[in-house]
Amino acid sequence: MGIESLCSADASEPFWDWNLTWHTENPDFTQCFQNTVLVWVPCIYLWVCFPAYFLYLRSHDRGYIQMSILNKAKTALGLILWIVCWADLFYSFWERSQNIFRAPFFLISPTVLGITMLLATFLIQHERLKGVQSSGVMMIFWLISLLCATVIFRSKIMLALNTDTEVDAFRYVTFCTYFILLLVQLILSCFPEKPPLFSEAVNDPKPCPEFSASFLSRITFWWITGLMIQGHRRPLEAKDLWSLNKEDTSEEIVPGLAKNWAKEWAKTKRQPLNMLYSSKKQQKSSDSNGEVMEEAEALIIKPSQRSSEASLSKVLYKTFGPYFLMSFLFKAAHDLLMFTGPEILKLLINFVNNKSAPNWQGYFYTGLLFVCACLQTLILHQYFHICFVTGMRLKTAIVGVIYRKALVITNSARKTSTVGEIVNLMSVDAQRFMDLATYINMIWSAPLQVILALYLLWRNLGPSVLAGVAVMILLVPINAVMAMKTKTYQVAQMKSKDNRIKLMNEILNGIKVLKLYAWELAFREKVLEIRQKELKVLKKSAYLAAMGTFTWVCAPFLVALSTFAVYVKVNKNNILDAQKAFVSLALFNILRFPLNILPMVISSIVEASVSLKRLRVFLSHEELDPDSIIRGPITNAEGSIVVKNATFSWSKTDPPSLNSINFTVPEGSLIAVVGQVGCGKSSLLSALLGEMDKKEGYVVVKGSIAYVPQQAWIQNATLEDNIIFGREMNESRYKRVIEACALLPDLEILPMGDRTEIGEKGVNLSGGQKQRVSLARAVYCNADTYLFDDPLSAVDAHVGKHIFEKVIGPKGILKNKTRVLVTHAVNYLPQMDTILVMTDGEISEMGSYQELLKQDGAFAEFLRTYANAEQSMESSDASSPSGKEGKPVENGVLVNDATGKLMHRQLSNSSTYSRETGKSQHQSSTAELQKPLAEKNSWKLTEADTAKTGRVKATVYWEYMKAIGLYISFLSVFLFMCNHIASLASNYWLSLWTDDPVVNGTQQYTNVRLGVYGALGISQGIAVFGYSMAVSIGGIFASRHLHLDLLHNVLRSPMSFFERTPSGNLVSRFSKEIDTIDSTIPPIIKMFMGSTFNVIGACIIILLATPIAAVVIPPLGLVYLLVQRFYVATSRQLKRLESVSRSPVYSHFNETLLGVSVIRAFEEQKRFIKQNDMKVDENQKAYYPSIVANRWLAVRLEFVGNCIVLFAALFAVIARNKLSPGLIGLSVSYSLQITAYLNWLVRMTSDLETNIVAVERVKEYAEMEKEAEWSIEETAPASTWPQEGKVEFRGFGLRYREDLDLVLKNINITINGGEKVGIVGRTGAGKSSLTLGLFRINEAAEGEIIIDGINIAKIGLHDLRFKITIIPQDPILFSGSLRMNLDPFDQHSDEDIWRSLELAHLKNFVSSLPDKLNHECSEGGENLSVGQRQLVCLARALLRKSKILVLDEATAAVDLETDNLIQSTIKSQFEECTVLTIAHRLNTIMDYTRVLVLDRGEVVECDSPDNLLQAKGLFYSMAKDSGLA
């Protein structure tokens, strides 16, 4: 009974009839089935989808779409369909009234269908109101409805044609109308609606076409075709890329992860905080950082006392879980569809064996196989698309959170996480999560596939499968051990990588010092030592990987062998026929994928777990307590800065650096902080900024703060951007600031005035200019409180005096502001309201200048000792407004070739910054300020990372092969071939075995068949192990070779290269590109080779079985190649654009880490976070189209593969009477795999081409111009050279590039051995150029320099630079021991080093350190004061004992006492030596033998100081300006 009662009033009509539907040459469904199931299926689909879809639309409102003709048409058709359905219903009621009783379905089906059509019409309108431009749910509904209606339509036509029965005319007409309306609805649903009103896409100049694309376009990724065509016609550029979808932007993604992490972090510290001011913390946390953007709030506000570990994995799951759920559903559907192939193959082989089966069944199976394969393709690539987008979002979120965290971690945390480590977190670790997102579902999917495959195998072969299962179980512990080991190696490798990147960062930051000292080789060895450890671990990983590949490639074969062996041996009557063998083989092939992918997934999870831990450790670092310093408006009148009983240390565990600090600064007063080197002056400012850990006490700083650090921090932006620093432009204030900070003459030097882009870290500015830009930034921001950390040290005293008068002093711009000035310049002290004297981290004295003199304490003694020095501060090189004024013109010249000639304008004498000439400069520089922005881009002094275009050249592959070694390369290919030949032979042998005749219920020769099958398998395994080892070892050879080349080429590059190239580009080469060469390219090569041979093998088998396939395979192959070439052009360029847009992310991040204290002081975190987000989004703008392009290609190529499946099955059906079941089984089972092979081959081809770009980018630097040879044996001078120290300049001229004017010309001067020569000159005179020429940092354009009779151009650079010593302006130290910083080549004994430290006045300090000479200097030497670093540089010079010493403003950053010590040391220890000093303070060279006066690149005067003063020339005017004449 049951459903039969619906079919007719008396239940006489059947619901299903096998004879009508299956066992016939002309199949059809029963009337009842047609009018129930085929009508209800689409209705059930829509009603099942409705609740979830309705809720989805409610939560995803994109704004409503206006009624369009398309929407009106769809709505009208929906209503007509409802009318047609209910016309049928009313007709049935009318029939009943006429006593014609039809089956119940004539009433039920039109009712259900009518209501469903009303629901569909409602959804059409609801989708419009919610902004859905193209609906997948509705399109699938119309498609299912049409397919079901097509079956009924065919049946009705056949009924009308084949029988004499009377046709129900009314129902015939209504059904035809219904069918046509469905067809029109389906066609209309293929077209998208207009964008919703007020949608962002309307205002976006380059919106991503994805959301406006139709459903059909989205599932086939047709919407990216426009970009693919564009990329095929010409190389893509950044401007061709679309904007990022809103839900993929940092603005949308990062806040979610940041908030969830903050909540998780808060949970781990439930216990009350044992802090002095915990109650105040709670009340302040809401408003103390009101400025900080919302998503950063959680990270910036929370203090960081941890009680237990927060779980980052839980947070990531909470944030990205919903995306993974979507991918879970798609993956589950795909996995189930995957097993339809073997099941249909089983039916197909049965069909071939059953000669009486009707032909249509074969075609039906073929069609079904094709449809299932196409569905599988569409679902698989939607799954992949979701995974990749999730991975992209995951990376965006992680990078965003790391950046936000980096802005708030404490200084002690910064020491544990160096710049290199944090950059690695952003590049390598974030990438690991991105990769994991693709594979994460395999954790459950692989076991599911294995279980389903084993179940179907059990059905096919029975208990014999248990033998295969046993083999698999045996392999599990082997792989578990390998996974554990891999994790250990992974941790070790990452540690080495961090150390290497950290060291490279330092090398790149201090490259000028390395070149001047000729230390490149020592540091190259240090890098290679770390690299050697890294490669050692990589080699161990490679052996493991080879073992892993061996076990996993052999696993399916071993499973098959053991299963078949047990099956045929257990019972002689078990026949291995084609159906059993090839269905099992198809299942084993399915089994191969999860078994092959599992190790990849495990290693990906292992890598991600290592990264997860590193990331969690970083995100759990202590953060600065925003409430340790009370900021903001203060009602009481105590003062602008109030510090009571405050004790500070650099970290919670360190002893206090500042003890019992008590002072109050009245509003608007000027305070000086003085003291010896390393007494805690800079620490005091850091404490007021909240950069130190407050142990106890109370600190209030009123209003906003502006901070000028001792070492100026300059951004890679225009001069104007550096000064405005994110604030609004106020022309009049800006001009006032420029003038007050003595920057007007510099604007004349710079080609585009303040619009000139200055290089990274301001490399193209002198120390003095950098300091003045840093000062101008602070002055412009108009803060309430100003903290100056010795800003006058890097500028000449004359300029310092101007700045003090115009800016800092009682009559300066800031006269009404509160100012705290750390200074070594005692001549300004009488003008101070209060002076704080620091001694060993405490305030030893405090009061006005007069009060302190009266106290007759340490301060008075200090002043008496240095009374002369005070006077000498007035006497200085007044010739220039900055400390190192040769440099602006000289390095400013590093500009684009076309416009370079225009730039080189030397300054006239009027450039001297003085009251008399101020007016004329102001006018000329105002014009500079107003130069049009249109020219801005032509004056960038640094070069952005550029993307190459076109195909990756074959030479790049050849270079990589050579790096591997040609022998290993060819051996690998040979072993790959052996492996695949053995694989094909074993399967062909199996097909012959299955075709063996059955005699008396058994097959003969079973033992032989089994033995040969096993032998082929073993030879396959040996070849697999061989090629795995060869590729892995070859990859390591290539890694070593390419890294060595890159390192050598970068170190050999001239200084101009580093001034043009942002360090982010170089760091990217050493981190991301080398990581790609280390870890990504070798496995890709392995998979590429494997896929290539798999495709070739499958085609050979199909052609052997059905030679007619030769008609189809070549054209399909041609389509395949065309589509692939079409794709690769775009994909390759997108990868390059992604690489290029990645560098600015690192550069900006590096820049932020270096200037984090300035950013925090100015409270600019919000703006910098936004900038970082924009740079990350720019990077993802190139990455997103590349992942879509991958899917676009895969869908098209899998369709080609599905066509091969279709034709292989079709030809097998056509030729079923001629072919053996074994061959058909072999052919179809291989064709089933070809789709996956093709897909994998293209992915690997594309991956190989896109990743080989890393080799291309590394090799790029091999072609750069190089410096001269480091050493030339033939011309190497004697080890005792130079004995005399005589330096002759003969007609010497110098230019910075071939197309530029000379900056030094016709220099003819002889400096005798032992002479002390001062070099002075006005701005741009060429003082620094002379030293750069002497060290051959820039080569001579004309003339020559002779030292002790040897032309320095003829000898090696190291031979020269080792023999001359310089004490540079910027004292740079490297992380490592103090001993390494003094003697990196380990050439000197401890006695020598201690003696040099004693002479440099550092012996007491170093002796007091726990580790003495092994004291670890932090990155950049940050754990020593600038003065102490300068003394270390002096100790280096003393240690080298060279005959020629060059001083480049070496005493700019030290106090007067230290300056005096340095000068006396130089006089005593270098008495016999030739000393060249670029004079910073004229008084220091007044006792020199001679003074060399340069002007406009020429020597204008050269004589003893006394004679020059009497001559009343240029030197006299400079001395007069300084008060020395």
UniProtKB/Swiss-Prot annotation:
- Report what the protein is called: Multidrug resistance-associated protein 1
Q: Which domain of life is it from?
A: Eukaryota
Q: Where is this region: Disordered?
A: 871-891, 908-930
* Keyword set, alphabetical order: ATP-binding, Cell membrane, Hydrolase, Lipid transport, Membrane, Nucleotide-binding, Repeat, Translocase, Transmembrane, Transmembrane helix, Transport
This protein's encoding gene: ABCC1
Q: What is its main location?
A: membrane
Instruction: Identify the CDD domains for this entry.
Output: ABC_6TM_MRP1_2_3_6_D1_like, ABC_6TM_MRP1_2_3_6_D2_like, ABCC_MRP_domain1, ABCC_MRP_domain2
Q: What are the recorded GO MF terms, alphabetically?
A: ABC-type xenobiotic transporter activity; ATP binding; ATP hydrolysis activity; glutathione transmembrane transporter activity
Q: Binding positions for ATP 2?
A: 1321-1328
What NCBIfam families does the record tag this protein with?
MRP_assoc_pro
Tell whether Transcription regulation is among the UniProt keywords. Answer: no
Q: Which GO terms describe its biological process?
A: cyclic nucleotide transport; glutathione transmembrane transport; lipid transport; xenobiotic transport
- Polar residues bias (residue ranges): 871-882, 908-928
The ABC transporter domain extends over 641-865, 1289-1521
Q: Where in the cell is it found?
A: Cell membrane
Establish whether keyword Metal-binding is in the entry. Answer: no
Ranges for the ABC transmembrane type-1 domain? Answer: 324-607, 969-1250
Describe its function.
Answer: Mediates export of organic anions and drugs from the cytoplasm. Mediates ATP-dependent transport of glutathione and glutathione conjugates, leukotriene C4, estradiol-17-beta-o-glucuronide and other xenobiotics. Hydrolyzes ATP with low efficiency. Mediates ATP-dependent, GSH-independent cyclic GMP-AMP (cGAMP) export. Thus, by limiting intracellular cGAMP concentrations negatively regulates the cGAS-STING pathway.
Transmembrane spans? 34-54, 75-95, 101-121, 134-154, 173-193, 316-336, 363-383, 440-460, 464-484, 547-567, 590-610, 962-982, 1020-1040, 1084-1104, 1106-1126, 1198-1218, 1221-1241
* Bilayer topology: Multi-pass membrane protein
- GO CC: one term? basolateral plasma membrane
